[in-house]
Amino acid sequence: MLMSRITPFLVVLAVVLWSAHPLGGAMEERLGLEFLFALRGPIDPPGDVAVVAITRNSARALGLSEKLHEWNRQPYADVTRSLKTLGARTIVYDVFFEAERQAESDVAFQNAIAEAGNVLLFARSEQDAIGAAQLEKLEQPLAQLRQAALGTAPLVLPKVPARVSRFFVRHPSFYGIPTLHGLAWLLQQDDKDKAMQALMDLPVSLPLNLYGPPRAIRTLEFSDLIAQPDVFAADINGAT
């Protein structure tokens, strides 16, 4: 009788102590969240967010290489103009536009970014070893594109575990630098000073709230936005 009463207590205590341990807490977050998401099921995603996916289908439809680094910048100029025309609130690129490509296409993309006035570009976070020390720096995109953009910011993802369960709202190594999604949110607030303070008061990373399986958030093909943008007017108007 005593054993039947004490066993559940010991099990609960073991779970609590294991969760309090850093290793246990990390495992609990990965496995526990996965279980809770499965138990909860899919939920409605935000209606003001759209993902533009660059897939093999888009590459083939545009007659371009499936290797993204081989593309010139004209398709990006075209899709930026489509998004702006359709009323996108903010356009956020997580592609790193590092080096010059075809000069004419670089200028076309630069002009499209400047005309849109609401484009954020990805700045890459890099680590260099100097002796025993690690130096981290932010590499900015191509200067002519950066100067045309509304802003740049890093996109930081955890290197482990393989399943992403958290996201960063600020760069973990640089004080006061929001990530791309943090900056996108910040720029949409009326009181930016207050919003920045709220962002700084948050933990540097937060648990990710999964809405459902892949493409649960409205996802559009890159090539479709170029070929037939008007079809997606309702999806893009007012969205980030």
Predicted regions and their residues:
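Active-site Gly/Thr loop motif
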Residues: L202, L206-E221
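Non-transmembrane functional regions of envelope-associated proteins
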Residues: L2-P207, I236-T240
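Extracytoplasmic
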Residues: L220-T240
